[in-house]
Amino acid sequence: MRDVPKSLGLSVTTPGGSSGAPDSGRHNSLEEINLDQFLKTSNYEDTVKQLDIYYGIVKRQLLRYQSPITGLFPVMSTDQVVGSVRDSVYCASAVWSLYQAYRRIDDDRGKSYELGQSTVKCMRGILECWVKQASRVELFKQRQSNQHALHSKFQLHTGEKIYPDEFYNHLQIDCVSLYLLFLVQMITSGLQIIYTHDEVAFVQNLVYYVERAYRTPDFGMWERGSKYNNGTPEIHASSIGMAKSALEAINGCNLFGEKGASWSVVYVDIDAHNRNRSIFETMLPRESSSKGVDASLLLTLSFPAFASHEDRLVEQTKQNVVNRLRCKMGFKRFTRDGFLSKNEDKSRRYYHSGELKEFEGLECEWPLFFIAMIIDGVFKNNNEQIEEFQNDLRRCLRTDVNGDPVVTMYYAPDGDGSYMRAPSQSLFLWGQSFFIIAQLLTAGLLHINELDPIRRYLPSYNRPRRAGRYSAFQGTATDLVVQIVLIAESMRLQAMMATYGIQTQTPHEVEPVQIWSSTELIKVYQHLGVNNKVGLSGRPCRPVGSLGTSKVYRICGMTVLCYPLIFEVSDFYLYRDMALLIDDIKTELQFVGKYWRLSGRPTVCLLIREEHMRDPQFKEMLDLLAMLKKGYCDGMKVRIGRLQNLISSSCIEHLDFMNQSDLTDNENAFSQINHEYIGYQSLTDVPKALTYVEEKISVAHFDTKPTPDIINALRSTDSIYCLCQLWGIILNREGPHFEVNGLNVNTALTQLYHRAGSLRYWRAVRYCSSLLHHIVDSISPFITTVLVNGKELTVGIIGQKETVFDKPMTPAEIQNVMYTSVQPYDVIQAVLQQEVVLYCGRLIATNPSMFRGILKIRIGWVLEAMRIYLQISGQQSIDVDNLSPFQVRILLQKVLTVSEWAVEEKLTTLQRRQLEGCLCRVPKHFYNKIWEILQRTPQGILTQGHHLPATPTLTNMSRGELTFNLLVEETLICIDRPERRQITVELLCIVATILNRNPELHFKQALDLDGILAEAFAMYCKDNNIQHQPKPEHEQTKNEDLKAFYSLPYSETTGYLARAAVNKVLQGGIFSTNEEDVQLDGDRLHDDNCKVS
C-alpha cells in the first residue's frame, strides 16, 4: 500500500497503512524568512519522498483528467465533455503549487518542469478558448450583458463553445478575475504563459472586461444569479472582490515576465479599482440583494483573492459565514440553496415562485469550505483554526482504490439527521485541488510566499515593490499630502489673483508641461489594447476619474497634467454654478486624499477661468484658495506649489504603449488667453455677471394655437422663460430641424440655454437643458453607489407611474427613462431629478447615515419634501425649479437630516410627519416587525385598498430579505398623503409591540390599518368634543381629513392608536389565542438580514 503524506494534524488512514503523524514543524509565519533555513526543519530525503507522494496524487487525481488537447479540466472526473474555466484554474493552481514546492529540490528528475508546463498548458488553453470569442469581449466592453459574456464552459477536448447563451448563465465576472489573478501569480513565479503581442492586447482587454464589476449584475460563483434561481443576475460582492484583487495584482505587471518590454505591461484604471474596492467593502458582510450570507466570500476574503485588508470588516464577514453556514459535514453555500438537494427537480433549469421554502434545512453541505478555512488558518498562522477544521474535514474523507485521500464533493441531508453522499465513483476536482494545496502547506512543503508570490495576503503597503517605472498600489500613506497646482487662464487673471496673495501659473509658465482635459487622456488610452488581428479596439470611452487625473503622465516624451472632470465645460449646466464648484473642489481634494493608494503623491490641477472671476460668488473661491494656501482643506494636508517643483514627488505614469505616430497634435490642450493689457487690479474692477430675475409666466394657452401665432409670439416677447416654452411647443410640433428666420429649433434652444446660463436664470436653464435631452455627466456610478448601499431609486412625477432603478444602467438607458417617463409630465423635472440622483449618490457615499431608514429613494417625493420645507420655513415664493444647483444640494441635505434640526427650528409634529413621510423613512428593525406581524396575521395587512398577504409572502421570502422589505415599502407608498403614511408606520410599530408582549395573541382577520386609524380618530374627536360623522367602512378615512389628529404629539397619537387596537380585540374577538387557527411560519433561524440603514 502507498505511503501517506504527512501533514499538520491531519491523518488519513489507508487500507493496510498507518496514519500520517502530525508534523511538529513550525506553522507558516507571515514574516519574511530565509527559505533555506525553513528547509532545515525537515530531513531532505523525507521532503523528497513526501513530494514524490504528492506528485503521484496529482498525476492520478488531477493530470489524469486534463485534456491533452486544450489543457482544460472538467468539474467531475467522469465528465468527458464539458471543460470548466473556474475549475480548470483551481486545478492548475494545485499543479502549480506542487511545481513551486519542487523548485527547492536540486534534482527533481523532470517532475518540476512537467508540472510547470502542465500549468502553462491549462492557462494557455483557457486563453485560446477566450481569444476565439474576442468579438464578445469587444461587445461586452460597450454593454455588460449575458449575451456578450465570455463563456465559462467549453467543449473539453476541442475548446469550442458547448452551451448557447440562452441555456447557460455564462456571465461570471469572478471567473475571469480569478484567471487574471492566477495568471499574474504564475508569471511572477517564472512561468512563461503569454507568448505574443496579440495575447498581451487580449489580456489588457480582459482587464477592461472586469473593470466594471461594481456595476455588472452577474450570475456569480454558483452560476445561478439570485438565490431564487429564476434566471436573474445580481451584483455579487464575491465577483466585485475578485475583480478588485485581479486589478490590483495585474496593474503594472509585465506579461512577458523578466524578459518583457514596455509594450507588454498591463495598465489598470485606478478609479475603476477604487469603485470596486469601495462598493465591495460597502456590500460586506452581504453577498447580494437576495443572499445575506454566502460561502463564496471565504474564497474572496481569504485565499486566493485576499480582497480586503480592513481587518474588522473581514473578520465580521468570515464569522458571519462560519456562524450561519457551517454544518457537520461542510458549509452550506447559502441558505435555502436547492442545488443537488433531495427536493430539487433536476428536470427544470429554474425554480418556481415560492419553491425555496422546500429546501430549507436540506441545503447540501460542502467540505470544500473546511479546506478553505484550513488554508486561511495557515495564512493567519492560526494553529487552533487549522486543527479545528482539520478535525471537521476528517469526517468527510475517504480513500479511493489507490489508497489516495478523496474529499467528498457534498453531503445532502435527507431531513432525518442522516446524509446522502455525492457519488463515490467521481472526483470533484476543485475540492481535490484545494485539498492538495492545504496538505502541502500544513506539511511544511510549501511556504505561503510560494503559493502567493505577489503577497496578496499582505496589506498593499507591506508588499514588495514590483520592479519597473509603472504605478503600483502601496496602501494609504500616513502622512499623505495632496499637491495642488493653480493654473490661471490669463496673465491679467494671474495678476489680479496675485493682488490677493494667491500665486498661480499660466499655461505658458508651466511649459513644456501641457495641461490637458481628461477627454484628451481618454483618446490616448484608446490606443491601449488595440489589436486589429484579433478585432479589439482598446480602452472604451470611459471617463478618467479623480484619481486618474491626479497622476502626472509621460507620453512620447511629453509631460502632461490633467485637470479633473469638475472643470470640464460640459453640456449639462452644473459647471455654471460657482458655489457648487467650490463645494466640488473640497470634495475632490477630500476624495483624492482618502482613497489614494499609489506610490508618489497625488497632484491636483485647479483651473481658474476668467468667467469664474465675473461670478458674484468668486470671493468665496478666493477664500477657499486662501485656506488651501495655509496647507489644509477640512483637515486634509495640501500643498500649493509651482508645477516644476512638485513633479519630482508626484506619481508619474509612463504610457509607453503610445507611438509617436499615433499622437496627434493636441489642439484642445488648455490654452492661455492673451490680452493687450493686464487691466484688472482687483475684483472691484471686474464687471460682474448679473443675476437675472423675471416673473414666472406660463404660455400653456399657446398649446392650441397654430404655429405661425407662436412664431409671432417669439418675436414679440422679451421673457426668457416664455421663449423657452414657446420654442418647446414648436419642438414638439415640428421637430428639432424646423427653421424660424433661418434658425433651426435646436440651435435656437442651445443659444437660449447659454444665454440663460450666463444670467444664472436656473429655471430657464433647466427648461432648455431638458428640451435638449441633456444627461448628467457620469451619472451611472452614482446610481450604482446607491444600489450597493442596499437602496433603490425611483424617478417620476407623483401621481404618475414611477420607474425603478434596481440595477446599474448605462447613461443611454438613464437618458431614455428620464425623457420618456418624466419629461412628458414635467419638463424641468427631467433634469432636476437627475441633479437629485447625482447628489444622493454623492451623499450616500460620504454620509450613509443620512439615508438611514429609507429603503427606496423616490426622487419625486424627495422634491416634494423640499417644497414642503420651503413652505414651512416661510419661503413659499421660492420655487425649487429656480434654485441654483448648489442650493438644491443644500436643500436636499436639509430634508434628509430633519431629525437633527427639527427641535431647534421648532417643527410641529405634523410638519415632521410630512417630511419623514415624503421620504418614507422607517425606524430601526421596522421590516422585521412587519415580518412578525404577518406571522401572526394569516389574512395579511390592509391599507388604502392595498393588501399585503401573509401567504405566499412568508413562504417565498425570508426575514430581513431585501425583496421582502421592498414589498412592504411598496405597500406604504400606496398611501398618498405623506403624514398619513408616517402615522401608519407608527401604528404598525404599536401593533408589533402589542403582539410581542402578548405572544398568545394572533389576528384571525386581516389587519385593517384604516379601520384602526378611523377608530383612533373617533376616540380623539370624542375626547375633544369634536363633531365627527363616521363614514361607511368601504370609505373609511380613505380621503378623510385627519389633519388635527396628525398634528398631535407622538405621545398622544400613540395612546389613541394603542387604545383603538385594543378596542378591536374587545369588540369582536378579532384576536385569537388558539395557535391552531394560525399557520405560523417556521422560519425562526433563517434570517438573511439586509441592513436598511
From Swiss-Prot:
GO molecular function, one term: calmodulin binding
Record's keyword annotation contains Lipoprotein: yes
Subcellular location, record wording: Cell membrane
Pathway: Glycan biosynthesis; glycogen metabolism
Gene3D superfamilies in alphabetical order: 1.50.10.10
GO cellular component terms listed in the entry, alphabetical order: plasma membrane
Family: Belongs to the phosphorylase b kinase regulatory chain family.
Name under which the protein is recorded: Probable phosphorylase b kinase regulatory subunit beta
